[in-house]
Amino acid sequence: MTKELLKFRTKYLPGLIAVFALSIGAPVLWAQQDKDPLKAWATIQQTVKDMETAVQSKNLHGIHEPSMKIRPAIRTLKGHSSMLSEDKAKKIGSALHQLDSAVTDLHSAADEGSQVNSETALKSVEGAFDQLKAEDPGAAFQNMH
């Protein structure tokens, strides 16, 4: 018994600790990448494209990574939107909230393995993204610098 415990402690435990530490640290690293609102906006644009590609190619497993990468970028834009005019901040904040909610629905549909529900949820993501694009966050945040 002690020999098996020693084998577990020396062979498997360090690997489990490393996996656990990396799984905790990855979202923090993504969040640190997107402190700049213009970089966050670029991340949102790219991840929406990645989600569209994943759903259209019926690769629902491909939804997970972009849906995790987009969240810190959404939070960054929400945080920076308070520096915009009240009306602009409200419109961008509303669009970001809808985008976040739509991404959650898409992630859930993909986790369920439902192509039909994923396509429906993707339309919601695209609608929220179009609403955000209409507010031209690139120009709004560019003027802040």
Q: How would you describe each model-predicted region?
A:
Residues M1-K3, V28, M144:
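N-terminal amphipathic/basic-hydrophobic helices that include classical n-h-c signal peptides
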Residues T2-I17:
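Bacterial N-terminal signal peptides that target proteins for export
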Residues A21:
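P-loop/Walker A NTP-binding region and its immediately flanking N-terminal helices
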Residues G25-A31:
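Sec/Tat signal peptide C-region and signal peptidase I cleavage site
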Residues Q32-H145:
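Mature extracytoplasmic or organellar-lumen-exposed domains after removal of signal/transit peptides
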